């Protein structure tokens, strides 16, 4: 059996022969990471990516200085979508080791689920995986209902049914109730709503291959909020939280929805479809209507919703939108505490009015006259949140997935956002 490569930490610079910018050096005892006190977690993550790139698949984190955050930074960079990697973790106290183990279980579940091929992960499989994860951490406190196919139409979940009807795999709504109180009448503290588009071709507004090749990841919002709830439970969440996952394929067929169709929602809103590739907001609307009906203190929806958010922030930050400044500040505080990247983008009352339609109350996409696509998408969603000015956060999760490797991440899912939402839920 191959001996594990030892990885140690040092606050001293590397030997001059390695250059003045060296972040790691190799010696007879293994590899030393040279911390400079400026961005130590980022340095560790980038070094781990390089170590993986060397083909080293077994490592042992040894010596002084390792804690949960540094171990996790190493794993975030070391983990990749192909092959098996083995890490021997340093000695940590019980609380730190439990926190690390929970991250390894839950956030790796999120990354692996998002990376799964669409052929293996359809709407029903995504919903069932979410149930299985949450039952693994709190089954006694979990109840759920799965509604699919024509039952969605009969129950007037018209956005989800319309988007998903073009696929042979029926659309699915997962409504899950985490209620640790044991009281069926306990108030709902928070609702989490996730976009679960298990493959997005764009529909008749079809994507080019260069934009479609990563669309197995269009369910990243659903996976992330599921992981966030599970992770919050491991951190002691004792409040009632409901989860709504809106799962569907967006495909082309003789039964697929078309431009010019009008969707009539249960809250009385009528929406004209002028871009079938703006489908995420159409399915989220159904989940947000259900979430609002619970009258929670907090609603968080999460979705890989717009290319505009990626244009603004790249894949480096999740985009945050809210009318509630206090709540937005709380989430950004949680993000800072968890070392996760979020950035607030504008959402104003006028964005709600930048989706005009000649035939319905709303258009599902903005026109050239209103180019702020991420903000108008958030404005669209606000029409389905009963009290949209208070207690609602929309996250356009542009940092969920990377099509190609970069210096700190392998290609694929990142798992970013799980810890921040869990932190907010348990604050």
From Swiss-Prot:
pH dependence per the UniProt record: Optimum pH is 8.5-9.5.
EC class of the enzyme, as a word: hydrolase
Keywords: Aminopeptidase, Cytoplasm, Hydrolase, Manganese, Metal-binding, Protease
Active site per UniProt: 207, 281
Binding site for Mn(2+) 2: 195, 200, 218, 279
Any one GO CC term of the record: cytoplasm
Enzyme Commission no: 3.4.11.23
The reaction(s) this protein catalyses: Release of an N-terminal amino acid, Xaa, from a peptide or arylamide. Xaa is preferably Glu or Asp but may be other amino acids, including Leu, Met, His, Cys and Gln
Cofactor mode of binding and number, as noted: Binds 2 manganese ions per subunit.
UniProt: Mn(2+) 1 binding residues: 200, 277, 279
Principal location listed in the UniProt entry: cytoplasm
Matches recorded under SUPFAM superfamilies: Zn-dependent exopeptidases
Location in the cell: Cytoplasm
CC cofactor: Mn(2+)
InterPro entries (UniProt xref): Leucine_aapep/pepB, M17_PepB-like_N, Pept_M17_PepB, Peptidase_M17_C
GO terms for biological process, alphabetical: proteolysis
UniProt keyword Amino-acid biosynthesis, yes or no: no
Molecular-function GO terms, alphabetical: manganese ion binding; metalloaminopeptidase activity; peptidase activity
Classification via Pfam families: DUF3663, Peptidase_M17
NCBIfam families reported for this sequence: PRK05015.1
Role, per record: Probably plays an important role in intracellular peptide degradation.
Sequence similarity: Belongs to the peptidase M17 family.
Assembly information from the UniProt record: Homohexamer.
Protein name: Peptidase B
Source organism of the structure: Salmonella typhimurium (strain LT2 / SGSC1412 / ATCC 700720)
Taxon lineage: Bacteria, Pseudomonadati, Pseudomonadota, Gammaproteobacteria, Enterobacterales
Gene: pepB
